[in-house]
Design a protein with these regions (language model features):
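N-terminal Lys/Arg-rich, disordered targeting/topogenic segments
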Residues: 1-14
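Long, low-complexity serine/threonine/glycine- and acidic-rich segments characteristic of extracellular
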Residues: 37-40, 44-139, 177, 181-210, ...
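Low-complexity, Pro/Ser/Thr- and charge-rich linker/hinge segments at domain boundaries
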Residues: 39, 49-51, 138-157, 229-258
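Cationic-aromatic interfacial patches
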Residues: 138-229, 234
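Surface-exposed, glycine-biased beta-strand/turn segments
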Residues: 226-341
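Zn2+-dependent peptidoglycan hydrolase active-site motif and core
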Residues: 312, 326-362, 390, 395
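Short, well-structured beta-strand-loop connectors
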Residues: 323-334, 365-381
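Conserved, short, structured surface segments that act as functional micro-motifs
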Residues: 344-349, 353, 370-413
């Protein structure tokens, strides 16, 4: 019996000793690791602010939280609103690696406009690594007011409606709806509260009265809906007997030109990504000195190759190979040769406005992507493509609808 008891004690000692060794080793490893981490940790604390986005806009009460899931425990945090320290629960002595400190911010106690929150933090390591983060944000507790500057617009077929919306503050969204099409409005200039867009009236749109609506929304989601009337006046467009282009010329063009479908696809792509501001200033200029207008905008044509159609551009004539220049500041988005339009240059002027210069003899020293100024040469007057004489086919599109370009030379949009 005694021998059995001694055997059990011996067995217990055999188990206990390794267990003690494991425990002591684990503690030593943990202490060593903590000791090592304490002296070597060098990463600055990572602290985030929930509830407020940088450069966001807010009204009323904001539920916020300071959160961290850091590599080393945070010893303290200081929070400043517009350089004045906020007294927050547990913000001074945190003592944890992972934590969340909720707080509420009542913007009604703040002035409308720009504010900032700064968060300074330090960890508990030997180096007391520190970080400082800044969140700029805006307060807007002003009731939204907006109006369309003209309650009614009267416009001819083939012309452009310049819509302007006046607001009492900066807007997040100003969108016009006309004939199921949506047009985004943008500030007339930096810091302006007048938002504008351009609505093209197709030359074949029936003369009638139409309603236009505006969806206006500020940066804190207040919204108003506005309405205005657009009266489209009928225009009697002239008729042309038509013309022919020699088959031999068309066959030659096919050898060196791309299909015009490629041009249309490229324009659709570019117009979706147009610059959200005007690149132009003042009136547009005629791209050549005009000796004669061979074909006015909207003329009804009948040709063998294209059948009956409306000419949605102007054909203007000067001496063969005369210099052609851009009618306004903009960015070259297309420079290529196409079957119908020949050597073609397209210039993006921003806000969905594009001009095209077609049938050029050749190109000036320009490349796609170049920003060019009004009056810069883009090529020479030619008769490439579907043309039977020297002329410039000048086209102006608004949101990819061709309108009368001469209107843009007479009015400041």
């Amino acid at each position: 019996m005694l021998g059995k008891k001694e055997s059990e004690i011996s067995m217990l000692h055999k188990v206990k000793i390794p267990l003690i060794i494991v425990v002591v080793s684990s503690i030593s490893l943990w202490v060593g690791s903590s000791f090592f981490s304490y002296f070597t940790h060098a990463d600055p604390p990572e602290v985030v602010l929930r509830g407020i986005e940088k450069d966001g806009c807010y009204a009323g009460m904001i539920n916020c939280a300071i959160k961290s899931d850091n590599g080393y425990k945070i010893s303290e945090i200081s929070v400043f609103l517009d350089n004045k320290e906020l007294e927050l629960r547990s913000s001074k002595k945190v003592g944890a690696r992972k934590f969340e400190i909720p707080f509420r911010l009542d913007t009604l106690n703040l002035a409308n406009g720009e504010h900032s929150i700064d968060i300074e933090s330090a960890d508990a390591s030997y180096h007391r690594n520190k970080s400082k983060e800044k969140w700029n944000f805006y307060v807007d507790n002003i009731p939204l007011k907006a109006a369309v500057l003209y309650p009614e617009y009267k416009v001819d077929q083939g012309r452009t409606v310049h819509v302007r919306v006046q607001s009492n503050k900066r807007l997040d969204k100003a969108q016009i709806k006309f004939l199921e099409n949506l047009y985004d409005c943008y500030p007339e200039s930096d810091f302006s509260n007048v938002y504008e867009c351009f609505i093209p009236i197709d030359c074949e749109l029936a003369a009638n009265e139409y309603m236009m609506t505006a969806d206006i929304q500020d940066c804190v989601q207040n919204s108003v809906k506005l309405a205005s009337k657009i009266t489209v006046n009928s225009v009697t467009f002239p008729k042309q007997r038509g013309f022919t282009v020699a088959k031999e010329k068309l066959e030659e063009e096919k050898e060196v030109s791309m299909n015009n479908r490629i041009l249309e696809e490229a324009l659709e792509k570019w117009i979706k990504d147009y610059p959200k501001k005007k690149l132009w200033a003042g009136n547009f200029e005629n791209p050549i000195e005009i000796k004669r207008v061979a074909t006015p905008y909207g003329e009804i044509r009948t040709t063998t190759e294209k059948g009956r159609y409306l000419h949605r551009a102007v054909d203007i004539i000067n001496h063969p190979k005369s210099v052609v220049w851009t009618s306004q500041n903009g960015k070259v988005i297309i420079k290529d040769r196409f079957l119908m339009t020949g050597n073609t240059v397209a210039v993006d002027h921003g806000l969905g406005v594009v001009t095209l210069y077609c049938h050029l003899e050749d190109f000036a020293d320009i490349e796609v992507g170049d920003y060019i100024k009004k009056g810069n040469p883009i090529g020479r007057l030619g008769m490439t493509g579907y043309a039977n004489g020297y002329h410039l086919h000048w086209e102006l599109r608004v949101n990819n609808v061709a309108v009368d370009p001469f209107e843009w030379t007479k009015k400041t949009f």
